[in-house]
Amino acid sequence: MSKLFWAMLSFITRLPVPRRWSQGLDFEHYSRGIITFPLIGLLLGAISGLVFMVLQAWCGVPLAALFSVLVLALMTGGFHLDGLADTCDGVFSARSRDRMLEIMRDSRLGTHGGLALIFVVLAKILVLSELALRGEPILASLAAACAVSRGIAALLMYRHRYAREEGLGNVFIGKIDGRQTCVTLGLAAIFAAVLLPGMHGVAAMVVTMVAIFILGQLLKRTLGGQTGDTLGAAIELGELVFLLALL
């Protein structure tokens, strides 16, 4: 299990992980790593939350929120934000399915992708600022949001098909079973309940699950399945929806 965790940490983040810690794990077994997603999200959110807490006393709430969002993006290498931008460029192009998938593969940033990035990043900064001004625990909120959003991404993997012939998303999409999905969602729910007691966290998770499930169905209808880009989009939007649900 430890090798699986370190392999997933190096796969979906840019945090430095010694290669020997995940040696011996075949790439074809990476799908089992879905159950570590909430824990990885917990770690990322906690680091981002600590950045907020340290900077808040020095430069105030808005700048602390800005830098916490920036640190979160840097830790993932902008991986999920890139998926969000590519997904929006493709889906909102209003072209054929095949053309949408081609656009999503294009490394150039389009208008819709740029607008999506601006909206999501600004929305996160504003929501974090508002939560802080209301006295909500930012470290716990960010840790829970990142854990839940990555856990809920399993909803776009279980019983979904990969929309392309090959790609990184093919490691997970359509490869996880019901037990893995339930364990992943269960871990995310536990983290949300412990970090944000009084059912506040669980209620926010339910709202996020509904939103991401609907998103998954819309993407399935539009693209014929899911891709690594749509998983990234789901994680980014999941974080935002969870934080909004805490307001």
From Swiss-Prot:
Chain ranges passing through the membrane: 34-54, 59-79, 113-133, 138-158, 194-214
Keyword field: Cell inner membrane, Cell membrane, Cobalamin biosynthesis, Magnesium, Membrane, Transferase, Transmembrane, Transmembrane helix
Predominant place of localization: membrane
Names of the cofactor(s): Mg(2+)
Catalytic activity: alpha-ribazole + adenosylcob(III)inamide-GDP = adenosylcob(III)alamin + GMP + H(+); alpha-ribazole 5'-phosphate + adenosylcob(III)inamide-GDP = adenosylcob(III)alamin 5'-phosphate + GMP + H(+)
Record's keyword annotation contains Calcium: no
Annotated InterPro entries: CobS (IPR003805)
Its membrane topology: Multi-pass membrane protein
Molecular function, one GO term: cobalamin 5'-phosphate synthase activity
Subcellular location: Cell inner membrane
EC number: 2.7.8.26
Listed pathway(s): Cofactor biosynthesis; adenosylcobalamin biosynthesis; adenosylcobalamin from cob(II)yrinate a,c-diamide: step 7/7
A Pfam family: CobS
GO-annotated biological processes: cobalamin biosynthetic process
Cellular component aspect of the GO annotation: plasma membrane
Assigned protein family: Belongs to the CobS family.
NCBIfam families: cobS
Its job: Joins adenosylcobinamide-GDP and alpha-ribazole to generate adenosylcobalamin (Ado-cobalamin). Also synthesizes adenosylcobalamin 5'-phosphate from adenosylcobinamide-GDP and alpha-ribazole 5'-phosphate.
Protein name in UniProt: Adenosylcobinamide-GDP ribazoletransferase
Gene: cobS
